[in-house]
């Protein structure tokens, strides 16, 4: 079966609007102006600090894209040291950790993001991936459900939810999840392949072939090769119709 990952590409954007009054005549007005100037200075300092955190964040994203995961983590750590309440940095740090197979550390990072912003669907989605990698399928399912509740059109979460359900032997529920993903994005070749796996695990040769055929039609070489060795097809692999499809 095929997983889907995502990372947060959005930056930390802060907009400051400054206003100042005209000439001041009274001592009260002068005091107010001094306070305003002090506030403006503080805002400028905060803006520079935020910009520095954003620079480290974008550096981390660049390193993550380049698969330099250890360096990406260091960059995100620097961003977090400046701005600890940054869910985006915590999420992408978790993705780098997941890529290094440090799943428990990744979970801790996603949990920090969720504590800061509970409705951040990327945190729940990637948390589900880490839990799936740890074979904690029920917990993964709960995380994917959270992600989908926040962003119903997140078809990647529906795909991975289907995988978790398959691992729990809830094949019909898995297929329903895959069908929801297809309703959002009809040309999802990996979904047809995963549906084929779910049907094969139930010894449903006809529907396994039907869905595998759709996956092969979209990406021929990949899925013919996968299906030849994927253990999910062990119940139907010896069947003539299945063998003919892989020719």
Describe the residue ranges of each PLM region.
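TPR/TPR-like (Sel1-like) alpha-helical repeat modules
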Residues: 193-196, 200-223, 247
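Terminal, low-structured helical/coil segments at or just beyond the last alpha-helical repeat
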Residues: 24-44, 217-247
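Conserved alpha-helical positions within TPR/SEL1-like repeat arrays
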Residues: 54-65, 77, 88-99, 122-133, ...
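Canonical positions in the second alpha-helix
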Residues: 79, 112-113, 146-147, 180-181, ...
């Amino acid at each position: 079966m095929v997983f889907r990952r995502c990372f947060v590409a959005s930056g930390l954007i802060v907009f400051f609007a400054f206003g100042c009054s005209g000439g001041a005549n009274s001592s009260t007005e002068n005091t107010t102006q001094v306070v305003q100037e002090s506030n403006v200075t503080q805002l400028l300092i905060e803006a520079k600090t935020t910009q520095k955190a954003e620079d480290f964040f974008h550096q981390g994203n660049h390193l993550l894209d380049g698969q330099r995961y250890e360096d990406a983590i260091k960059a995100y750590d620097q961003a977090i040291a400046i701005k600890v309440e940054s869910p985006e940095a915590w999420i992408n740090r978790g993705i780098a950790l997941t890529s290094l197979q440090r799943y428990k550390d990744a979970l801790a990072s996603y949990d920090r993001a969720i504590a800061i912003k509970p409705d951040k669907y990327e945190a729940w989605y990637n948390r589900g991936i880490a839990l799936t990698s740890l074979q904690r399928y029920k917990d993964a399912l709960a995380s994917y459900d959270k992600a989908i509740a926040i962003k119903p059109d997140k078809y990647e979460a529906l795909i991975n939810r289907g995988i978790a359900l398959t691992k729990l032997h809830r094949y019909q529920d898995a297929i329903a999840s895959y069908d929801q993903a297809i309703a959002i994005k009809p040309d999802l070749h990996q979904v047809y392949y995963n549906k084929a796996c779910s049907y094969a695990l139930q010894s449903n040769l006809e529907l396994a072939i039907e869905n595998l055929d759709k996956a092969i039609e979209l990406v021929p070489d990949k899925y013919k090769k996968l299906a030849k060795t994927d253990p999910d097809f062990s119940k139907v692999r010896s069947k003539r119709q299945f063998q003919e499809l892989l020719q």
